[in-house]
Amino acid sequence: MKNFNELSVTSSYKESNLQLVEQKACIVVGIANPRIKIRVEVLLSESPEYQTIYISSGSEIGKLIEEADLIIGSGITAYEGVARRKPVIVVGDYGLGGLVTPDTFRSQYNNRFKGRINGMKDESFSLESLEKEIKKAFSLTFQELQMMSNQIITYQNI
């Protein structure tokens, strides 16, 4: 997973020229609600440090999540992201649920990753608050992501 705060650069040798290629953080967005999706698109379109991919069909969820550095979405997209040890920001029909962390995992899971806990349908949220969550997402450790993934497996087997 790429660190948002660090510039990740790779080099390649091509025709006697050394080329530096900036690696952007890949954010996969899986939001069904069109109004909420537009709000997220507005923020991410203004952020050149991200490569953003929007899920358009259920059949591509797994492949895109594997390639992602961060998932923004709700429902099955968020669930799959956590299961595959990716940082997930829950944004759905019930607003901004925020970054899924070991402290918030159980309540988000019980809320089916639909948005803010006890949120209202079509609840609004500020783009600034989403931006803060994106920056926090890249500080989760592999151990934290693994722990939440293991919890999903445990809950499935109950």
Feature map (PLM): residue ranges:
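Catalytic binding pocket for nucleotide-activated donors in carbohydrate/polymer assembly enzymes
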Residues: 77-142
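An anion/phosphate-binding loop that grips the pyrophosphate of nucleotide cofactors and donors
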Residues: 68
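Glycosyltransferase donor-sugar binding loop
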Residues: 27-37, 54-57
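Conserved active-site histidine-acidic residue motif and adjacent donor-binding/catalytic loop
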Residues: 53-64, 76, 94
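Nucleotide-activated donor-binding/catalytic signature segment of Leloir-type glycosyltransferases, i.e.
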Residues: 41-56
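Short beta-strand->alpha-helix junction loop in the catalytic core
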Residues: 1-10
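A short, well-ordered alpha-helix in the C-terminal region of glycosyltransferases
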Residues: 136-157
